[in-house]
């Protein structure tokens, strides 16, 4: 692919982005074997603040209230969002590299949410969903010619600011575990064109969901013992989908990741099952500190997933678990010598920018 694209005007920029991304991630192990934990503090040299900040990534979802949205006359903007935009301004994803540089000094990487891609004034960049009565605008379509030009503009802005994409948190591909094979294959198709987009902007990893929040079959009691046959076909389909995507991801040079995010993969054991069955270095975990069903999963779930992660972790403070011990979560990363990127995802109410800054400080202070 590289040889065929040398004539592209943006290829030098993409090489620049890829070189930056590999620098931090290269030292991380790609194996999936659980290892014993040694005392990190005894073995590792304490890093400077600037060195720690190079491991951090801004999170566009955390400040999505500040982004320009499609105008809907029947849905006026809430007063609290208007106040935030008066304070920080309104912007698009094209502005996010500069926002990251200016708002979080020292942070050079970004975690970009899929629903914020595109120019909301240009419908040609989006899918069109036809109903009996109307055509509704859907998700950003990275394969559209106008979208490819948009992504090149994003690359230019990243190069000019020195702030580049590490990861795409993607909600666009759906139904990867669905029992309807037509829907599942469509989800795979969408994920592949997004992997191409991730490659275009120089991201090294991309999260894809297994399915919607409703897919979480529960056990039933049979002969006095819990049994859950209902979940098996969903797991089987997820495994097949991620096998195909991992092969495609390897060719693109972008890792496909599974986050504890909704439904089937809200349980870390299901993520481990999928990853072990796929058994491909281009398919790994991207754990989130807080996306758990209950409080006892907060730290134990992270310990289960972190050996399978080399590219991205979401450091989250969330209203569901407002008292999450961020330092304890980071100690788990330290113990496993995690060297991938850490995206700061604040979702605990109030001012999202100030909340992100505080969370960033908490994570950096706990890193070694």
Where are these regions (language model features)?
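Surface-exposed cleft-lining segments at the edges of enzyme active sites
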Residues: 177-183, 220-234, 258-260
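A short helix->loop->beta-strand "cap" motif at the edges of active sites that frequently abuts
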Residues: 163, 254, 336-340
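Short acidic/histidine-rich active-site segments
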Residues: 341-347
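Active-site groove signature of glycoside hydrolases
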Residues: 198-224, 252-261
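Acidic/histidine-rich catalytic cores of soluble enzymes
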Residues: 70, 109, 228-335
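Hydrophobic residues in well-ordered beta-strands that form the structural core
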Residues: 58, 167, 207-208, 258, ...
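N-terminal pre-domain/capping segments
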Residues: 4-205, 232-233, 280, 284, ...
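Extracytoplasmic/secreted cell-surface and envelope-processing proteins
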Residues: 217, 265, 352-353
